[in-house]
Curated annotation (Swiss-Prot):
Catalysed conversion reaction: 3''-O-acetyl-ADP-D-ribose + H2O = ADP-D-ribose + acetate + H(+); 2''-O-acetyl-ADP-D-ribose + H2O = ADP-D-ribose + acetate + H(+)
Biological process annotations from GO: purine nucleoside metabolic process
Record function comment: Deacetylates O-acetyl-ADP ribose to yield ADP-ribose and free acetate. Down-regulates ribonuclease 3 (RNase III) activity. Acts by interacting directly with the region of the ribonuclease that is required for dimerization/activation.
Protein name (record): O-acetyl-ADP-ribose deacetylase
Source species: Cronobacter turicensis (strain DSM 18703 / CCUG 55852 / LMG 23827 / z3032)
Lineage: superkingdom: Bacteria
Pfam families: Macro
Residue numbers annotated as active site: 35 (proton acceptor)
Keywords, sorted A to Z: Hydrolase
Domain annotation Macro: ranges: 1-175
Amino acid sequence: MSGRINVVQGDITRIDTDVIVNAANPSLMGGGGVDGAIHRAAGPSLLAACKVVRQQQGECQPGHAVITEAGDLAAKAVIHTVGPIWRGGHDNEPQLLADAYRNSLELVTANGYNSVAFPAISTGIYGYPKAAAAQIAFETVSDYLTRRPQPKQVYFVCYDEENFLLYQRLLGQYDE
């Protein structure tokens, strides 16, 4: 496990990985936060690809993930996953958040990619408590990686200092 999980602070649209995960909304049509940043950086072809996915299968439900081209991003693909809206933790939010990470990793593996960058899913406008979300992210990704050789590298890309420090602390615990 050591060395396969990395924590960085910065702009996920500038990370050099095969795949960037987008914390999308169910419509897949872009929005605020990381979703808006990824759509702006990728250009109109990402929105066009999302429209095709939406026409084929409708909205993306919480915990689910879909893959599209990456548009103008350096990445080869974007995986759009919808995390849960925090409703106090009694509406299956932990399972849905774990599913968002796991289903994204399954798409990375199924498409033969070696590296993926995750944002802190659901911790923005969806209001998931950051520490709890970070714990679920690490547990889910670590569990996945212990049983599979792919992806070779997973990056947690934290935009803000609070998430960065939470993820750094967890990385230290998982590397021990």
